[in-house]
Amino acid sequence: MFFIHKLFPAKLIRRYKRFLADVKREDQHIFTVSVPNTGSMLGLTTPNSNIWLSYHNNPKRRYAYQLEIVEANNTLVGINTTLPNKLALEAIQNNLLPELNGYKTILKEQRYGIQSRIDFLLRDDILPDCYLEIKNVHFIRQKGLAEFPDTETKRGTRHLEELIKIVQQGKRAVMLYIIQREDCSAFTICRDLDPTYGRKFDLALESGVEFYAIKCQVSVEGIFPIQQVKIENRK
């Protein structure tokens, strides 16, 4: 996925109120940008970090610049949480998830469960319906090991509960973790930051929910899914 807008380098001063960050451009001009990420962004908000911004010439936007990439541990990390669904679709189309081959139709944002929407619903005349939920991942503490979540996520736990119900109905349920960084070879659940999610993950796995993780190559030109990484169920 290539960026539609050219990215501009800057330095991070601080992130605050979740959706905002103060940044400093190369000419030392300081201004506020929007942050398309509702999560904690743990490990990605260090002051003076190298960052990259997209510019949007839209008078309806309050902030013309938007944070897209943060450099952490000499690695470019995508932080825009509106992108993982696009990256997941690209991964499927590029055969990075052969486990999902054979489906004729891919529907987006379909209602299911109790007031929930599934990111993708895959359908076929022969194969069982496949409900595909996408999660964004950026967090790494141990070299080469990506983790999710980076904070408590009641919404994420609820999604696992819904996927368990899908399997109980005789359909396929899949959770796909999109890792917006390249410096990892494995993925695991971050149980110490959200034990409840960890327990629900175990139950979902035992119930037949399928789990996959794909890492991405991140550059100032774009973000591209490149390969699956193994999931380690560490307890």
Swiss-Prot record:
Gene3D superfamilies, sorted: 2.40.50.580, 3.40.1350.60
Cysteine disulfide partners in this protein: none
Listed GO MF terms: DNA binding
Pfam families noted in UniProt: SfsA (PF03749), SfsA_N (PF17746)
CDD domains named in the record: SfsA-like_bacterial
Record NCBIfam families: sfsA
Family listed: Belongs to the SfsA family.
Name of the featured protein: Sugar fermentation stimulation protein homolog
Species, as recorded: Bartonella henselae (strain ATCC 49882 / DSM 28221 / CCUG 30454 / Houston 1)
